[in-house]
Regions:
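Beta1/beta-strand and adjacent pyrophosphate-binding region of the FAD-binding site
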Residues: 2-17
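Core beta-strand elements of the Rossmann-like FAD/NAD(P) dinucleotide-binding domain
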Residues: 5-7, 99-109
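Structural motif
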Residues: 9, 31-33, 109-110
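Flexible, glycine-rich phosphate/dinucleotide-binding loops
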Residues: 18, 41, 53
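Gly/Ala-rich phosphate-binding loop of Rossmann-like dinucleotide-binding domains
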Residues: 22, 26
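Glycine-rich FAD pyrophosphate-binding loop
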Residues: 27-46
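N-terminal Rossmann-like dinucleotide/flavin-binding domain of flavoprotein oxidoreductases
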Residues: 45-104
Length: 111
């Protein structure tokens, strides 16, 4: 996806840390996009059973990743399914351009 207006926060990677960042950014009313090439949850999505996550006795990594995504999207974050191929920073505009398979995304900050 190519954006005309810069978003506030672009997050590269949809693992637990990426979605935690997306949740906090979205709660702060920042326009937020997570760019993930694989499955929600990142590497945790490949785990068959998660039994040590506080408050959740047992579920699969794929289910936990899906919950991360639903939580972030429920607060207004967007998710792009694409592989990031590069990131440029323009000192004049103070903006980042994230290049990925779906186009370019311009952002004020990148995590």
């Amino acid at each position: 996806m190519t954006t005309d207006q810069p978003i506030d926060v672009a997050i590269v990677g949809g693992g637990p840390a990426g979605y935690a960042a997306a949740i906090y950014a979205a709660r702060a009313n920042l326009t937020t996009t997570v760019i993930e090439q694989g499955m929600s949850g990142g590497q945790i999505a490949t785990t068959n059973e998660i039994e040590n996550y506080p408050g959740i006795p047992l579920l699969s990594g794929a289910e936990l990743g899906e919950r991360f995504q639903q939580h972030a999207e429920g607060l207004g974050a967007q998710v792009e399914w694409s592989m990031v191929t590069g990131i440029d920073y323009d000192t004049d505009s103070a903006l980042f351009t994230i290049h990925h398979d779906m186009g370019d995304t311009t952002a004020k900050s990148v995590i």
